[in-house]
Amino acid sequence: MVVSGVLTAPAVLTAPHSGTSNTTFVVFENSHVNITAPLPFQHPSAGPLLRYSLETMTSPGFSSLAVNSTAVTPAPAVFKSLNLAVQIILSAIMIFILFVSFLGNLVVCLMVYQKAAMRSAINILLASLAFADMLLAVLNMPFALVTILTTRWIFGKFFCRLSAMFFWLFVIEGVAILLIISIDRFLIIVQRQDKLNPYRAKVLIAVSWATAFSVAFPLAVGNPDLQIPSRAPQCVFGYTTNSGYQAYVILISLISFFIPFLVILYSFMGILNTLRHNALRIHSYPEGICLSQASKLGLMSLQRPFQMSIDMGFKTRAFTTILILFAVFIVCWAPFTTYSLVATFSKHFYYQHNFFEISTWLLWLCYLKSALNPLIYYWRIKKFHDACLDMMPKSFKFLPRLPGHTRRRIRPSAVYVCGEHRTVL
C-alpha cells in the first residue's frame, strides 16, 4: 500500500500490534491520500486502522481532506472524442453552412427591405424566417465550429446558457413562421378566406418573436441549469433526473416540433384534398361549354370555374414551395428533437462513448436547414430569383436562369380566351 500526501500539519498513525505489516499513515490538513493497493492484499489488521484514520481525516481539524482510492471507486467513463479526419470534415461542412446561411438569408432580407414590390404579406413572413436563420448563423454556428476544433467549450458558463437561449429562440421563431404561412394557405385554398395582409403579417411576426423569447428566456437565467458542454459542441439538453428540467424539455419539444408538425400536416392534408376536389370539378365541364352554352348561361357563370382553374395553378405552386420548406424542416429537425428527448431521459444513451460525434452530426443537420431555405427561395420563387440576379454584380451573374416553363405566364390583367369569339374578363 502506498500513502502519499502534501505536507501541512502532520499527524502519524502506526499499527499498534506486533506481527502486523509496517504500515504508517501520514495525515495532513489539505492533504491528498492515494491508496493504490487493492483490498485483497491489505493486511487484515489494517482495516480497523484505515477506518479510524479516515474518520480522523473527516474531523473538523481535517475538513479540507480529499481522498482518492483507485481500489474502491472506479475511474469515470471517458467519452470518445473526434479524430482528426472527422474534425476536418465537420469543420468544412460547418464553414459551408455558415457561409450560405449568412449570405443567402441576408440577400432575402435586403430584397424585401429595399424593393417595395417584394413587401407582400408572404414575403414579409419569409424575410422574418430568413432573419432568424441569419442570426442563428451569426450567434451560434461560429461557437459550435470553435468547439469542434478544440473539442471543448471555452466560452464560459454564462455564454453557454446565452447561446442555448439564442438557439431555441431562432428555432422557435422559424417554426412559427412556417406555421403561420401554412395556416394562411389553408384559409385561402380550403376556407376561401384571404385575411392576411402586410400589416397583419407584421403583427403576427411581433407576436411570434415575443412567444419564442418567452419560451427560450429561462435558459439564459439558468432555469433549467445547463452545464458547460463536455459531450456536445454546444449547450444541449443532457441526462437528468430533475422533473422540472424534464418537463421543460418536453414543453420546448412540443412547441418547437410536435405541435407545429401536427398543425401543418393537417393543413396540408386539407389543402391537398381541396385541390383534388377542385381539379375533378373543373375537368368535369364539357370541352365545348364555352361555345355551346355561353348564350344560355352568360359569361358571368363561366367566369368562376375558369378563374378557379387559374387561381389554383398559382396557389398550387405557392403551396408546393411551402411544402418543400416543411419537408426540409421535418428531415432536419425530427432527428435532433428525438435525440434531445432520449438524451434527457436515457442515461445509457447520454453516456455512451460516441455521444459527442452523434450530437455534432445531428446539430449540423439542424443548421443545414438555415442554408437550404434561401436556396429553395431562389429555386422556387421567380421574384426572389430575379431580384437576386439584379443585386449581384455583373461579373458574378453566372447562375442559370429559370427554365421558360417555370416563368409566370398569367398576369392579373390578362384576358383569358374562352372560345373563338368569346372571352372572360
UniProtKB/Swiss-Prot annotation:
Select a single GO molecular function from the record's annotations and give it.
G protein-coupled receptor activity
Q: Which CDD domains did the record assign?
A: 7tmA_GPR63
**Membrane-protein topology:** Multi-pass membrane protein
Q: Which residues lie on this side of the membrane: Cytoplasmic?
A: 113-123, 191-202, 273-321, 380-425
Its transmembrane ranges are: 88-112, 124-148, 166-190, 203-222, 248-272, 322-345, 358-379
Q: Which UniProt keywords apply?
A: Cell membrane, G-protein coupled receptor, Glycoprotein, Membrane, Receptor, Transducer, Transmembrane, Transmembrane helix
According to its UniProt record, in which tissues is this protein expressed?
Answer: Brain specific.
Stretches of the chain found on the membrane's Extracellular side = 1-87, 149-165, 223-247, 346-357
Q: What is its main location?
A: membrane
- Statement: the UniProt record of this protein carries the keyword Membrane: yes
Annotated compartments: Cell membrane
InterPro entries recorded for this chain?
A: GPC_Orphan_Receptors, GPCR_Rhodpsn, GPCR_Rhodpsn_7TM
List glycan-bearing residues: N22, N34, N68
Q: Which Pfam family, any one of them, does this sequence belong to?
A: 7tm_1
Residue ranges of coiled coil: none
KW Cell membrane (keyword) present: yes
* Cellular component GO terms, alphabetical: cytosol; membrane; nucleoplasm; plasma membrane; receptor complex
Q: Which Gene3D superfamilies match?
A: Rhodopsin 7-helix transmembrane proteins
Cystine connections: none
Q: Which residues form the signal peptide?
A: none
Q: What role is this protein assigned? A: Orphan receptor. May play a role in brain function.
Similarity annotation: Belongs to the G-protein coupled receptor 1 family.
UniProt-recorded name of the protein: Probable G-protein coupled receptor 63
Q: What species does this protein belong to?
A: Mus musculus
